[in-house]
């Protein structure tokens, strides 16, 4: 699974272990969104991935990934994830600093472009010295609020697989009302970040957002390669 990572994070972290790429940025579930925090804004999130029962492909586990994201100005945000916290078994703690830049935001046409990079720095039970995840994305927001995201990624070896991996990353967001959004994202490929995650995003209060999804592996899904993903985020200002 996602590097138990969460993911590809669990990632990647996202190595995150095994469950989620643990991306130190604003995301849909695992795939980065094209949102960028304004200068001085601070956002914190805790991701929890878990599988309550054993299966052929994936054993019972739980994983927790905290992250913080800060708006740096000039359409740039920076972040930090702490991945590799997995039970049962030894932790493989990994620091994941990240940066996201939005070079284009259409005012009326709904288009946006972002570029991003994550550096993976294992600090405990290290399986490799350092790794990298780089991506480019474009999104289109329609008048009804629907947003579609598509892009490409590259993971260096040992982050989500023993070899370098490249592919596509995609997202879908459909607001139902001011408090509820149906969403899904997907990393292509057969590696620890290769999951499709549908779910819902819901506003708990003016500063708190909840996420509930279910990650389904691109391979061995019929043998149990799937798990729950819960996230809670807080906007400090």
Regions from the PLM with identified roles:
Residues 23-158, 172-181, 185-237:
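Transmembrane beta-barrel domains of Gram-negative outer membranes and organellar outer membranes
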Residues 163-170:
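Short loop-to-alpha-helix "cap/lid" segments that border enzyme active sites
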Residues 1-28, 237:
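Cleavable N-terminal export/targeting peptides
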